[in-house]
UniProtKB/Swiss-Prot annotation:
The gene is spire1. It comes from Danio rerio (Zebrafish). CDD domains: FYVE_SPIR1, WH2_Spire1_r2-like, WH2_Spire1_r4, WH2_Spire_1-2_r1. This is Protein spire homolog 1. Residues 1-23, 160-183, 375-406, 419-539, 630-694, 728-761 are annotated as: Disordered. Residues 36-223 form the KIND domain. Residues 728-739 have a biased composition (Basic residues).
Length: 761
């Protein structure tokens, strides 16, 4: 027996008489989630209730019966006898009600209040005696034992009558007077008055007993949740261990009854306090125990209110050293106690395993290992060019040497020889002289002359007009009379173009070679369009002539297409800020409802706008133009390299398309040859000013036609014209510096082939 009336002996751990296990108890006896039956509480704890809970259940049941007795007069069915703890329902708020069958037997007479009180007393006694064996009896406090005795013996007391012929003694009369008040129990109100007299302050009885029932409900719900978590944890542990069969119960394994016993002890210790020493006290304490708060709430309230006193833990009269130091100091002390590490200088690491070079490193290594070009001084170039003028032959010698069988193996002449304007000399016919002149011509073609630098303007136009312009020049000057070249059994003669860059003597780097076939003395076979296999080399060769335009430094900032586009967008934003004082125009331009160029055309649902791909502003159809601009990978090209090729060309009519194509091809070949042969003339550097420089079609095939506004188009054209004007100024200055070199040329430099000679070639 404990202070609170709870039994914690081993007998309390026995299962109920009906054999039901706590984990098998369901909520069948409850009407909802907000109430619990007393039988479930007893089964879950496997222990009886304490005396304070018995007082509370008795008081709350009598209150409910009193309310039902009042309603009996209004026609409500009277309550029946209480069969057991399963008929008592404890709600979440602390109120108690009794279970009544829905269909009572009409033939059974209704129970009287005395019978109901007697059944209530028996039910409370069973709850206090729950789990005990037959030969065991619980010792109760005198007031509670007297209350249960009165409730269970009301029927006997009422039927007893005093003997008329028997006179009691004085002592018996005094004892009867003392118990007169207690024995005078006739209904529910008398039981309630006895419960009120149990407390020191009867006015607090309703709240106190309701709090006791509420605490009983809360603790039971928490215990059930705790047991469910333990059960699920055990099941998960069995699944992890892979146990398929039901394991045998271990003697050391704690069951639900043990957990319930520990739970009750913890709750009692938290509510009553822990006593370190046994103190002789009275078994019955009339003072009420605090039930307004749960044990957890009481403990937290004490912590918040600091109703505690901490004592220093002393070891041999002093505080332990571990409590003096912080965790950081203890860790540092442990690290210092370890053996010291070797210094870095004394450590010897293993040699690092060589890693294979990455792809980027291999590419850089190949670039660095490329054979370096030998620099050629300008004096050597000038000396070799001036001394080689006597060995250059004329076009008449070319036709004369073409009849010799060894002609295909000889280089006749390039346009560079004609551009120099040297005196015509007859080339020897024999093989030795021909080989000597051949090697001399090869050496002359290695580097450009000053005359070539002077006439770079017209050469750029001739090299970038079309992809077959350079090949047309070479076919008009060089011919192969060997029939083997026509059949494809012998490689055709090859030569370097005019615009080839200077190369070292040991390197052979012809970027473009053309095979020349002769079918008739006065007829030249046209070139076939380049295939996909050699289009890359052809484009590179065509670009070499166009690259001469950028071989001189330009006295202005060289802007790329992407940079010019960014500059234009910044200028457009600045231009938009000028209209801030005009709110209507500013809002219309900012929202894209007004043309940004003319600022007169408004856009609506049926009138859509065009977006300029350069400045990203909406414009109308009249202010929108088409231009060919490079895509994102080619946006880093200089803006001056675009030229007129960015403008879409007008296609001729369908009827005149075939005739114009053939006539333009023949006239283009004629004009390109005339421009290449007129480099040495005084007016040759300005003769092609009307033909603007264009990029070849191979370069602009992947360019997309974009919609730009007229302002952006004018902006681009102004930048291109300014850059070309600065470039031409630089070339004119270079022409004046090198003009003295051409004055020493021989009289044969004024040679110009006639139109008849050009046609024959």
């Amino acid at each position: 027996m404990t202070d609170g009336g709870m039994l914690i002996s081993p007998s309390a751990l026995q299962d109920p008489g009906d054999g039901a296990r706590p984990e098998d108890i369901a909520m069948d006896c409850t009407d909802g989630e907000e109430e619990l039956c007393l039988e479930e509480i007893l089964t879950l704890y496997s222990q009886p209730i304490n005396e304070e809970q018995a007082w509370a259940v008795c008081y709350q049941c009598c209150r409910w019966l009193t309310q039902k007795h009042r309603r009996k007069e209004t026609g409500v069915s009277p309550p029946g006898r209480i069969a057991g703890p399963g008929d008592v329902r404890i709600r979440k708020d602390g109120n108690v009600k009794l279970y009544q069958p829905s269909n009572p037997d009409k033939h059974t007479p209704p129970s009287s209040s005395i019978e109901i009180i007697e059944s209530l007393g028996i039910m409370i006694y069973k709850a206090l005696d729950y789990g005990l064996k037959e030969h065991e009896e619980r010792e109760l406090s005198p007031p509670l034992e007297q209350l249960i005795d009165l409730m269970t013996n009301m029927a006997d007391t009422e039927t007893d009558c005093p003997d008329e012929g028997y006179e009691a003694t004085e002592e018996e009369d005094e004892g009867e007077e003392e118990n007169a008040e207690v024995s005078n129990v006739r209904g529910y109100r008398d039981i309630i008055s006895l419960c009120l007299s149990h407390l020191p302050s009867p006015s607090d009885a309703p709240n106190h007993y309701q709090a006791v029932c509420r605490a009983l409900y809360a603790e039971t719900k928490e215990l059930r949740t705790f047991l469910e978590k333990i059960k699920s944890a055990k099941e998960n542990l069995r699944k992890m261990e892979g146990e398929t069969e039901e394991p045998v119960r271990d003697l050391n394994e704690l069951q639900n009854a043990d957990w319930a016993r520990f739970w009750v002890q913890v709750m009692r210790d938290l509510r009553h306090g822990v006593k370190l020493k046994k103190v002789q006290e009275r078994q019955y304490n009339p003072l009420a125990i605090e039930y307004q708060l749960t044990p957890y709430e009481m403990l937290m309230d004490d912590i918040r209110s600091k109703r505690y006193k901490l004592r220093k833990v002393m070891v041999n009269g002093d505080i332990p050293p571990r409590l003096k130091k912080s965790a950081h100091e203890i860790i540092l002390e442990f690290i210092r106690s370890r053996p010291p590490l070797n210094p870095v200088s004394a450590r010897k690491l293993k040699p690092h395993a060589p890693q294979p070079p990455t792809l980027h490193e291999r590419i850089l290594e190949e670039i660095r290992s490329e054979r370096k070009l030998r620099p050629v001084s300008p004096d050597m170039i000038r000396r070799s060019r001036l001394g080689a003028g006597k060995s250059i032959s004329t076009p008449q010698d070319l036709f004369r040497s073409s009849d010799i069988p060894d002609g295909p193996r000889k280089l006749a002449i390039s346009t560079l020889s004609l551009a120099n304007g040297t005196s015509p000399a007859r080339s020897p016919v024999n093989g030795v002289a021909g080989g000597h002149s051949l090697s001399q011509r090869k050496r002359l073609l290695k580097a450009p002359t000053l005359a070539e630098l002077d006439s770079s303007d017209s050469e750029e136009e001739q090299s970038t007009r079309k992809s077959d312009s350079s090949s047309s020049i070479s076919t008009s000057l060089v011919e192969d009379t060997s029939p083997e070249s026509v059949m494809g059994k012998k490689p055709p003669p090859q030569f370097l173009p005019i615009s080839s860059t200077p190369q070292p003597d040991k390197r052979i780097a012809p970027q473009r070679r053309h095979s020349i076939e002769k079918e008739a003395p006065t007829n030249i076979r046209h070139f076939l369009p380049p295939s996909r296999q050699n289009s890359k080399s052809l484009a590179h060769a065509l670009g070499s002539g166009h690259a001469e335009e950028f071989c001189f430094p330009v006295e202005c900032l060289t802007l790329t297409v992407e940079e010019v586009m960014h500059i234009r967008q910044v200028l457009v934003k600045a231009e938009l800020e000028k209209f801030q004082q005009y709110k209507d125009i500013y809002n219309a331009l900012k929202k894209g409802k007004l043309c940004f160029s003319c600022r007169s055309k408004k856009f609506s649902l049926f009138t859509w706008s065009y977006t300029c791909q350069f400045c990203k502003r909406p414009v109308c159809s009249q202010c929108c133009k088409k231009m060919k601009l490079p895509s994102k990978p080619h946006a880093s090209l200089p803006i001056s390299s675009l030229g007129p090729s960015i403008l879409p060309k007008k296609e001729p009519g369908a009827s005149s398309a075939p005739t114009d194509k053939t006539s333009s091809t023949s006239s283009h070949k004629k004009n390109s040859l005339q421009r290449s042969l007129s480099r040495s003339s005084k007016h040759g550097d300005r003769s092609s000013s009307k033909d603007e420089l264009e990029l070849p079609e191979q370069f602009t095939e992947d360019w997309s036609t974009m919609e730009v506004c007229v302002d952006c188009k004018k902006f681009i054209n102004d930048i291109i014209s300014n850059s070309r004007r600065n470039l031409s100024t630089k070339r004119a200055r270079l022409h004046r510096r090198t003009h003295s070199v051409y004055s020493s040329s021989t009289s044969s430099s004024n040679y110009k082939p006639t139109e008849r000679t050009i046609k024959e070639v």
